[in-house]
């Protein structure tokens, strides 16, 4: 059973598998190699991926996207407050954690970001299973290099809810470097800078790749809240203000109008990567008012100028941390859809004094490609060029504990190789202190109040002694997923305590995960029932219209009038029933099918026997579903702006 690699993106996700010595990026059921990270809830079903994004203008409040911008964060995070201005769906606080509120099948539901991400992961898993023809459980999932401990844990939980055994959480730029290194057959030692600007996150990593097989991350930097969506937001704000100026109407109060404007803005942004001007035309955008306008590339660049410039700060930081200067970088590799923006490319090129950028790998697929390679390695694949690959990654943030006066004492410095283990000895702060509280933080600031709290535990039972005498050994053990275990031991008694940092404030409990796993299975069953219902309905519709057409077009004398009327009456009665029972259950459609077949089959057989020898009419074979007549064998598709 192969293991798959999943790039779980903010706006789009992608899945790949390594087999027969190469990576296959797997297309979904719509034939697309990337799948929108969208989940929609309607009064009858749940949609994931392309179908969800396609109906977003009709159902903006119940179509959820950007779960990656919520995952592992607290509700009061200022970044979430900023995003909520742009989201049409509702985000509420549930014990300090963000939850997404939607209407599903007439009921109000609340979903954790992990659940929404797990639904996208389930879709990617099903895409791979359909292609490979077998069930899949093992996967490598990628995260931005700058994701913190709680965001990594939450992503792992999402995989678990989706029924995946997460072999490893790996960093997106590292995965992209793997794709680049293996694809290009690099010789010698090369310093490679990966510039990864996606839909919602931004990472820079510098790696040394030796002979295309040893991948050593030297440093990493980034912004987990910068990407294509932020550029869309600037354009949407600009267009909404232009609409207000022209027509004295503010469309921002209307979620549907705002969504149609966002879709048009996203399309214009893409156009501006290859043209210097984009035209926006939206009919009846708000209160019947059409909206036609043009946006030039120069105007778009001006709107996003500060955001584009902000991409260079992490590049400088990564270079400083790797102790390299610009001239030591051999290759600059662009990853992520937003690196197609010409201004982003030209700023980066100027920063590196005109050095050519490497555009040779597919920016949308490189991360999934690398994840698929890592999945194959971790599941023991020894084939071809991956057998010698060794990947050495680093910790994105410093980790430490709070000591007297709220000082952050670091045990693991950022950019240290992982897995890694560090031990330091501490002591008590006051005489006869019976216990110590170990408070764990991550971040770069000198005081813990400015850093991110990960968790706390108490070590009690310290024998009475003057301050500074007891020896308490604290060990930080950072595993290959970038997830932290902390232990503390009092040396005189040998008393020890340890925790895996689970960031209990922001993280799901085991009970919640178990509940979500069960719910995910229930939703999958409901989706399957819905699919079966639609199939049965389509079969009945197809059969009834075929029979009706056959009878109506039967040559004179082939069928007596009484039989003809009997069949037509039964068909029309069934069509009326279909129209008034659109939400009937599968069993009801099957029952109607049986009833109709029983009634029509003998008459149709008689008609065919009478016509035997002559050229047969349009044959609706008795009692069988006639394939794909008209548009009735599948769902009807409507285009939405």
Curated annotation (Swiss-Prot):
GO terms for biological process: chaperone cofactor-dependent protein refolding; heat shock-mediated polytene chromosome puffing; protein refolding; response to heat; response to hypoxia; response to unfolded protein. Disulfide bonds: none annotated. Changing residue 544 to I: In strain: Z(S)24 and Z(S)49. Changing residue 437 to P: In strain: IS4 and IS5. Residues 613-633 have a biased composition (Gly residues). Changing residue 606 to T: In strain: 3CPA126. It holds the Pfam family HSP70. One of its GO terms (cellular component) is nucleus. Transmembrane segments: none annotated. Changing residue 195 to L: In strain: ZZ30. Induction: Heat shock induces the synthesis of seven proteins at five otherwise inactive sites in the polytene chromosomes of fruit fly larvae. Two separate sites, producing two and three copies, respectively, code for the 70 kDa protein. Expression is induced by proteotoxic stress caused by toxic protein aggregation, for example by overexpressed Atx-1/ataxin-1. GO terms for molecular function: ATP binding; ATP hydrolysis activity; ATP-dependent protein folding chaperone; heat shock protein binding; protein folding chaperone. Keywords: ATP-binding, Nucleotide-binding, Stress response. Changing residue 430 to A: In strain: Z(H)1. Residues 609-641 are annotated as: Disordered. There are 5 or 6 copies of the gene encoding this protein at two separate loci, 2 copies at chromosome locus 87A7 in reverse orientation (Hsp70Aa and Hsp70Ab) at locus 87A7, and 3 or 4 copies (depending on strain) at locus 87C1. Most strains have three copies at chromosome locus 87C1; two tandemly repeated Hsp70 genes (Hsp70Bb and Hsp70Bc) and one in reverse orientation (Hsp70Ba). Some strains, including that sequenced in the Drosophila genome project have an additional copy making three tandemly repeated Hsp70 genes (Hsp70Bb, Hsp70Bbb and Hsp70Bc). Forms a complex with Hsp83/Hsp90 and Dpit47. Belongs to the heat shock protein 70 family. This is Major heat shock 70 kDa protein Bb. The gene is Hsp70Bb.
């Amino acid at each position: 059973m192969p293991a798959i690699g999943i790039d779980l993106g903010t706006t789009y996700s992608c899945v790949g598998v390594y087999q027969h010595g190469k990576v296959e990026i797997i297309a979904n059921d719509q034939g697309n190699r990337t799948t929108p990270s969208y989940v929609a809830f309607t009064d009858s079903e749940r949609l994931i991926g392309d179908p969800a994004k396609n109906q977003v203008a009709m159902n903006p409040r119940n179509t959820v996207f950007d779960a990656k911008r919520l995952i592992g964060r607290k509700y009061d995070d200022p970044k979430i407050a900023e995003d909520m201005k742009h989201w049409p769906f509702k985000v509420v606080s549930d014990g300090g954690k963000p939850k997404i509120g939607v209407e599903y099948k007439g009921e109000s539901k609340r979903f954790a970001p992990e659940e929404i991400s797990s639904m996208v992961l389930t879709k990617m898993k099903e895409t791979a299973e359909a292609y490979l023809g077998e069930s899949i459980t093992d996967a490598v999932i990628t995260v931005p290099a700058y994701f913190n401990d709680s965001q990594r844990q939450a992503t792992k939980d999402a995989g678990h809810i989706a029924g995946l055994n997460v072999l490893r959480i790996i960093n997106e730029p590292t995965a992209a470097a793997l794709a680049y290194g293996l694809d290009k057959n690099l010789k010698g030692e090369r310093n490679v800078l990966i510039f990864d600007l996606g839909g919602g996150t931004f990472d820079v990593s510098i790696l040394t790749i030796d002979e295309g097989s040893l991948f050593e991350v030297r440093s990493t930097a980034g912004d987990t809240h910068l990407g294509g969506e932020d550029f869309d937001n600037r354009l949407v704000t600009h267009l909404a203000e232009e609409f207000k100026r022209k027509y004295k109407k503010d469309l921002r109060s209307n979620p549907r109008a705002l969504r149609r404007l966002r879709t048009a803005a996203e399309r214009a942004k893409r156009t501006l990567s290859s043209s210097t001007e984009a035209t926006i035309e939206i009919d009846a955008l708000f209160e019947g008012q059409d909206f036609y306008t043009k946006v030039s590339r120069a105007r778009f660049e001006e709107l996003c100028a500060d955001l584009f410039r902000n991409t260079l700060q992490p590049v400088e930081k990564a270079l400083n941390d790797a102790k390299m200067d610009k001239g030591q970088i051999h290759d600059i590799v662009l990853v992520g859809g937003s690196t197609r923006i010409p201004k982003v490319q030209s700023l980066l090129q100027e920063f590196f004094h005109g050095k050519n950028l490497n555009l040779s790998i597919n920016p949308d697929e490189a991360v999934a490609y690398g994840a698929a390679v890592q999945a194959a390695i971790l599941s023991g694949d020894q084939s071809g060029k991956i057998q010698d690959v060794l990947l050495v990654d680093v910790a994105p943030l410093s980790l430490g504990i709070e000591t007297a006066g709220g000082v952050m004492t670091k045990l693991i410095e950022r950019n240290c190789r992982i897995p890694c283990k560090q031990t330091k000895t501490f002591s008590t702060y006051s005489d006869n202190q019976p216990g110590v509280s170990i408070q764990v933080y991550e971040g770069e600031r000198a005081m813990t109040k400015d850093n991110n709290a990960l968790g706390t535990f108490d070590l009690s039972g310290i024998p009475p002694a003057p301050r500074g005498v007891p020896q308490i050994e604290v060990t930080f053990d950072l595993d290959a997923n970038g997830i932290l275990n902390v232990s503390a031991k009092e040396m005189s008694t040998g008393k020890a305590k340890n925790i895996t940092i689970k960031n209990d404030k922001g993280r799901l409990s085991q009970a919640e995960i178990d509940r979500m796993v069960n719910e995910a299975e229930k939703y999958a069953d409901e989706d399957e029932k819905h699919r079966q219902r639609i199939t049965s309905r389509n079969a009945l519709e197809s059969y009834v219209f075929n029979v009706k057409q056959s009878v109506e077009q039967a040559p004179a004398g082939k069928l007596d009038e009484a039989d003809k009327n009997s069949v037509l009456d039964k068909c029309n009665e069934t069509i009326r029933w279909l129209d008034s029972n659109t939400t009937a259950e599968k069993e009801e459609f099957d029952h109607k099918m049986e009833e109709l077949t029983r009634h029509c089959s003998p008459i149709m057989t008689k008609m065919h026997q009478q016509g035997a020898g002559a050229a047969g009419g349009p044959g609706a074979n008795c009692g069988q579903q006639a394939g794909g007549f008209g548009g009735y064998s599948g769902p009807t598709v409507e285009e939405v702006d």
